[in-house]
Amino acid sequence: MLNVELSGGKTLLQADAFKKPNMIDEARMETYLSAVRKERKNLAENVYKDEILELMGITSDGVPTLAGLMVFSKYPQGYFPQLCITAVSLPGTEMGIVGYDDERFIDSKRITGAIPDMLEDAVSFVRKNSRIKTIIDDNGHRADKPEYPVKAVREAILNALVHRDYSIHTENVPVRIEMYRDRMEIINSGGLYGKISIDALGKVRPETRNAALANMLELLNITENRYSGIPTMRNEFAKAGLPAPIFSAVHGEFKVIMKNGLYSDEEPADESVVEFCSTPRTRAEIVDFIGKSKNYVMSKIVNPLVKGGKLRMTIPDKPKSPNQRFVKA
């Protein structure tokens, strides 16, 4: 049985299974040790591997720390099932609003693995469930603009994974990604750490809740560990012409709210669908035109256009008829 104890501010894992080679990502560990030898030469010279692991907080008295587990184990959730990410894409602007086919979620995924793996999988989830605005410039060149700046999304997810509370009190609380029609929310347990206030975020150097974890990810070139995450988010949203991210810390949680700015009544992508439907179109034709899943297209685009009076159904008394077509109102 797994026994968790606190010692010197570190969570220790009395789990012999982690010591088995097949439970450790050996390639990641070697990358890390190579970086230590290169970047921390005063540490690496004449110091054995086991001593490096102790000094850098990966192990304590030969036992892996929680930080070490979350970075170097192939599957940390074998020990802590809820130290993961739950990600959902929703059809409306609030939880509980159902979509065209009464679905509660357009997409839902539990993202597991070590922190570097969860980060990449979470960014991929957001990409998959994001709309793309196509812009044609004066020279006829096409450019695709994502719903959310990818670099900012990555920083927000990384911040949630690195700075969340990993104490025994919150080990059953995943990081949450909730993609609504008009915004995305990224939520982690723990609230703000130390004396910093919301207004000071990105302006002053904060205290670090999980310093050893941040240092490991810095040496793996996953985070800069220079407190640049929030300024990067703000800058990326400004460059994209989107509202600045909103940060809040209430009820022991830290939340980032990112508004997409793509869902006004004059949204060009929606208008292109309306024009496409100048000729009555089937669901399949509209799905092919947009290039997204049926649930996504119907829940986030077609159904709102029908409710907004921009499209009408050719068989309004049988909305789910297989012969249904949609035409410009």
Which role fits each region the language model picked out?
Residues 1-171, 177-181, 193-195, 199-206, ...:
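Active-site helix-to-loop segments that bind/position phosphate- or nucleotide-bearing substrates
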Residues 243-245, 306-317:
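A short, conserved structural fragment
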Residues 184-221, 264-266:
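Glycine-rich/acidic phosphate-handling loop/turn and adjacent ATP-lid/helix
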Residues 313-329:
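Short, cationic-aromatic polyanion-contact patches
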